[in-house]
Amino acid sequence: ILDVEAIAKRTGAKVISNYEIVGYFEKLGIEGHPMNHGGKWTFDFGTVHYTNAIHSSSFPDGTYGGQPGGFVIETSHHRLYIAGDTALTYDMKLIPDVIGELDLAILPVGDNFTMGIDEAIKASTFVGCNKVLGVHFDTFGYIKIDHNEAITKFAKAKKELYLLPIGDNLKL
């Protein structure tokens, strides 16, 4: 959330999030589109579904950030799930049933503040996706992970885990 303002102002990107977060950034002059749990909206790039997530939600100044959420983004070629910095939740099981098969699941793996490696493996099973891009890890001590151990655990579960350095990309 700390980079949203700078990125949106630099790129002109629209902020898509819950009502409270969009309202916060609109006060800073940034265009947004508010959503809420269970909602979907079709944009020029594809359809966005707002999904459940479980974690705290506040801004650095203490402003309440509303109920947390994740997203499923559908384009003409791909469908991906962005869990956000959530815990494992049983609601994830609904995603493939309600929205459809995923090409990639972007899941937190750092533990302590989010789910860890073992829970991310379970989450990838819940959402029915064997390709996972790990996020929310290694930025500070509490969420450091052993990359080799994480990749090995995913491989033993017959899943692929991608742990990209900052600035890298992944082609679907």
Predicted regions and their residues:
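Active-site metal-binding motif and surrounding structural segment of the metallo-beta-lactamase
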Residues: 1-26, 31-33, 97-106
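Short glycine-/acidic-enriched loop or helix-start segments at secondary-structure transitions
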Residues: 1-4, 25-27, 60, 91-93, ...
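Short, glycine/charged-enriched secondary-structure capping and boundary segments
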Residues: 5-7, 30-31, 63-64, 95-98, ...
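Metallo-beta-lactamase
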Residues: 9, 13-16, 49, 73-130, 135-144, ...
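Binuclear metal-ion centers of metallo-dependent hydrolases, dominated by the metallo-beta-lactamase
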Residues: 14, 22, 26-40, 121, ...
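Core dinuclear metal-dependent hydrolase active-site scaffold
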Residues: 34-100, 166-172
